[in-house]
Amino acid sequence: NLDSDDDGDLLKDDEEKSSDPATDSLNPDTDGDGFCDGPVTIADVCEAIDAFPTDETEWFDSDGDGIGDNSDPDVDGDGVDNEQDDFPDDPSASKDTDGDGMPDTITGNSTSDPALVEDLDDDNDGLTDIEEDVNGNGTFDDGETNSLDPDTDDDGYCDGNVTIVDVCVAVDAFPLDSSEWLDTDGDGVGNEADTDDDGDNVQDDADQFPKNPDESLDTDGDGIGNNADDDDDNDERKDDNDAFPLD
C-alpha cells in the first residue's frame, strides 16, 4: 500500500502538493520554524499547527486576519494596538487602569486561560465603579468621582478609603474639591475654611489643640491638655489640691 501521507503531518501528499503555496509532503515542517504544516504534533520535530507553513518568520495568527502575530500591530484584533493594549492576546479586554491584572471592562468572551475577570474597582481606590458612576451611564460626569482616577480632584487625598503609594492618601472628605480634604469635626466645612476645626467652640487661632475637641489649653506647655493634665501649671501640686491650678 502506498502511504498517502509520507511525512505524517495529517495532510495528504496530494493536498500538500496542490496547496498554494505548496508544502513539502516529505517534511512535516516545511519552513523549519518548529511548527508543523498539519494539525498534529510530532515529538522532537514540530508542534501543531503552523498558520503560515511556508513562512519561517510566522506561525500564529490569533485574530485570523491573515497577518502573523509576529508582525501584526494588533494581535487580538480588538482595534487597540499591542503597545496600548494591556491584554494584547485577548480581544475581550484592553485596559487595566490600576494594573491589578483585571480588565476595566470585558466585551464578549475572554479567550485567556483562565478567563479574565472584570475589575469592579478600576482605579483601586476602595470605591466600586458603580458607586462612583452615580447615574450609571458609564461616563465620568460632574458631581461624580472618576472611576479611572483614584484622586479625582488631584489634591493628594484618595477618593476612597484606600491609600495608594506614591499617588494619594486616604481618605478625602471632599473628593471633588481640590482645596479641601479634611473635616475633623464633621460639620461639612473643610478644615482649610473652618475657623474651628474640632468644633469645640474655641477658634483655631486661640486653640492649642485645634484638631482635638477635648482640649484647647495647655497652661504649662508640657504637651498635655489641661483637661487631661492633673497638674496644669506644673508646680508639682495636683490640681485638685492646688488653690491656683493655672498659676
Predicted regions and their residues:
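Extracellular calcium-associated, cysteine-rich motifs in secreted modular proteins
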Residues: N1-D247
